[in-house]
């Protein structure tokens, strides 16, 4: 416990808040190239084959990111846009791929929540 004089001389150090998406370096999104596209299984109470991609970003950092929606066209060397946002039941997956931009096509046949999946308005 510091004395009053010690606090006057030095003051308390402000706690820095940690970023939830450090690889983005304070940018809203980042572009990257898929190095590996694969499926993985979620943590204990859940069971599925979740689609994920390993992406090398333009700043040189390699991250694992989730491919949302039903079906995708991504493969190795696909150029994708990454945003922050973790997947709770996949450890180490802290980023999402933005659908409907660059090489990633929007979800086909999507009627509701279309903007989140890059789906165009049905005619």
From Swiss-Prot:
This is Small ribosomal subunit protein uS12. CDD domains: Ribosomal_S12. GO terms for biological process: translation. It comes from Trichlorobacter lovleyi (strain ATCC BAA-1151 / DSM 17278 / SZ). PANTHER family: 30S RIBOSOMAL PROTEIN S12 FAMILY MEMBER. Belongs to the universal ribosomal protein uS12 family. Part of the 30S ribosomal subunit. Contacts proteins S8 and S17. May interact with IF1 in the 30S initiation complex. One of its GO terms (molecular function) is tRNA binding. The modification 3-methylthioaspartic acid is found at residue 89.
